[in-house]
Amino acid sequence: MDRHLCTCRETQLRSGLLLPLFLLMMLADLTLPAQRHPPVVLVPGDLGNQLEAKLDKPKVVHYLCSKKTDSYFTLWLNLELLLPVIIDCWIDNIRLVYNRTSRATQFPDGVDVRVPGFGETFSMEFLDPSKRNVGSYFYTMVESLVGWGYTRGEDVRGAPYDWRRAPNENGPYFLALREMIEEMYQMYGGPVVLVAHSMGNVYMLYFLQRQPQVWKDKYIHAFVSLGAPWGGVAKTLRVLASGDNNRIPVIGPLKIREQQRSAVSTSWLLPYNHTWSHEKVFVYTPTTNYTLRDYHRFFRDIGFEDGWFMRQDTEGLVEAMTPPGVELHCLYGTGVPTPNSFYYESFPDRDPKICFGDGDGTVNLESVLQCQAWQSRQEHRVSLQELPGSEHIEMLANATTLAYLKRVLLEP
């Protein structure tokens, strides 16, 4: 037989065998998860996601206020609702009503409030649905994640919540969060990275402290913490006493104070004795100075005794010395003047003079460094990353923050 003919036949035979084998390998590759990075859950801070409301009220505080709506509308953030006179309608709708008997809050009569977009990122990327820059929040971070290969609503999801309430009143939220984490684990073939900002970190600490270690080891890859008020925030005393407009110029501090007081999460974020000295004076007045041992008198003197009950309800929700039990990355801003104590010449209805300390402009350095204490209390790594000059909100778009997050997510 012709040697050349045999060689050709052998080559054809091998080719005939290799082609199906190659196709099988290609099909096998298609069945493998294409995911090469861990899924991400983003958790906002106080005021950090949209809220919607629907009205059917028995009465209103002003004739310009809507009494009934056919559908849900944006309650937060809608700058048009914060204009003079109209803001009275908004405050009456967004406030919570505290019941001392049940030790729980409820919505005002005829007001139903819901959190839009659980599992999505839109309600956290822009607080104002019109996407004005004043309401930009997680947008830059989500855009960065998309650039790294993530997809909104799929392997990067949001976990918004009713930030007016403390964790003890948001039970269904934590059930939904756990279910979403487990679903993402199954869909994308690996554990989740939690990325939280501000009060969202304390929410996640509450959540993680209540999960079995075996669950955390399976479902949580890492927890990236941005600007966490682990030990409370000094400015909370000013918020409760005389209000704080959160740098929104159209809102007067005293005007917004009623809403801020009614939010249980405000009292929850008062400074804690595991971080601050019992002797530290936070509020100075001509007649009385207030330390963290004087909260009961403080609430009585500002005419808001419900706040004392709220504090008692929430003070023990998170165990300060119990670490999260997962790999933790604490990123924190420094070098930005941060309210540390307040001097009132007329208490509590006038703006105080402010004494500043170190921090990110909102969260004091003493509070955010609480995570240092966990380095020796858990087996999982606890890393700290200082962000010099990084302000509390701006740190979400900080180049160092994004580079750090990228390393956590994409490096082996």
Swiss-Prot record:
pH effect summary: Optimum pH is 4.5.
Result, substituting residue 360 to A: Abolishes enzyme activity
Annotated substrate binding sites: 46, 199
Chemical reaction(s) catalysed: a 1,2-diacyl-sn-glycero-3-phosphocholine + H2O = a 2-acyl-sn-glycero-3-phosphocholine + a fatty acid + H(+); 1-hexadecanoyl-2-(9Z-octadecenoyl)-sn-glycero-3-phosphocholine + H2O = 2-(9Z-octadecenoyl)-sn-glycero-3-phosphocholine + hexadecanoate + H(+); 1,2-di-(9Z-octadecenoyl)-sn-glycero-3-phosphocholine + H2O = 2-(9Z-octadecenoyl)-sn-glycero-3-phosphocholine + (9Z)-octadecenoate + H(+); 1-hexadecanoyl-2-glutaroyl-sn-glycero-3-phosphocholine + H2O = 2-glutaroyl-sn-glycero-3-phosphocholine + hexadecanoate + H(+)
Listed result of changing residue 65 to A: Abolishes enzyme activity
Activity control: Phospholipase sn-2 versus sn-1 positional specificity is affected by the phospholipid composition of membranes. Phospholipase A2 activity toward 1-hexadecanoyl-2-(5Z,8Z,11Z,14Z-eicosatetraenoyl)-sn-glycero-3-phosphocholine (PAPE) is enhanced in the presence of 1,2-dioleoyl-sn-glycero-3-phosphocholine (DOPC), which promotes lipid bilayer formation. O-acyltransferase activity is inhibited by antiarrhythmic drug amiodarone.
Cystine pairings recorded for this chain: 65-89
Entry keyword annotation includes Repressor: no
The UniProt record lists the keyword Cytoplasm: no
Family to which the UniProt record says this protein belongs: Belongs to the AB hydrolase superfamily. Lipase family.
PANTHER family: LECITHIN-CHOLESTEROL ACYLTRANSFERASE-RELATED
Protein name: Lysosomal phospholipase A and acyltransferase
Lineage of producing organism: Eukaryota, Metazoa, Chordata, Craniata, Vertebrata
